[in-house]
Amino acid sequence: VENRTLRYLLYSFIALTAFGAGVWMNRTRQTETLPVAASDALLALALPDLQNKVQSLSQWRGKVLVVNFWATWCAPCREEIPIFVKMQEKYRDQGLQFVGISIDQADKTSEFSSNFKINYPSLIGTFDTMEISRRAGNDKRVLPYTVILDRKGQIAATELGGLTEPKLEFLLKSLL
């Protein structure tokens, strides 16, 4: 009976470890897993900003572009935005550009942007905009979801869930 219990615990540990590794590895996808069409669709996206002026993501081609799908009611989004503000300030002169795509109402996004002193463009998307994030690897259509494009406009990395400062620094390091 003791051997049987030990074996059960060992198999359970192996299964949980394999599952955890699979989840962790799937969190950050590299370009090879995403079609070029996904980056083209993302760059073709044109949405209104907080002044209701339509902005196309293609205007930032040639920069390292960090596109973050978020909402004001999303707790992990609220945690990572101060990091984005800090990174935008730190790396702006090296060609880094953040763009937030809020899946929320414009008035709520505007108030949030003021309160959090967001120093990069905030565009207003809809739940239909989440289809673009799905094409860029967000299969579950959850928030936050971040797509990092290199200077050539190709998807370099994606992140499902909130980003930490060390993780973001790591992802940006080779692109800047």
Model-assigned labels for residue ranges:
Residues 112-118, 125-173:
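Thiol/disulfide oxidoreductase modules built on the thioredoxin-like
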Residues 78-117, 127-134:
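Structural microenvironment flanking redox-active thiols in thiol-disulfide oxidoreductases
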Residues 45, 69-70, 112, 120:
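Conserved hydrophobic/aromatic "anchor" residues
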Residues 44-65:
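A short beta-strand-turn-helix
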Residues 63-65, 69-73, 105, 142:
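Short pre-active-site segment immediately N-terminal to redox-active cysteine/selenocysteine motifs
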Residues 61, 69-86:
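Conserved redox-active cysteine motifs that mediate thiol-disulfide chemistry
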Residues 1-44:
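N-terminal targeting signals for export/organelle localization
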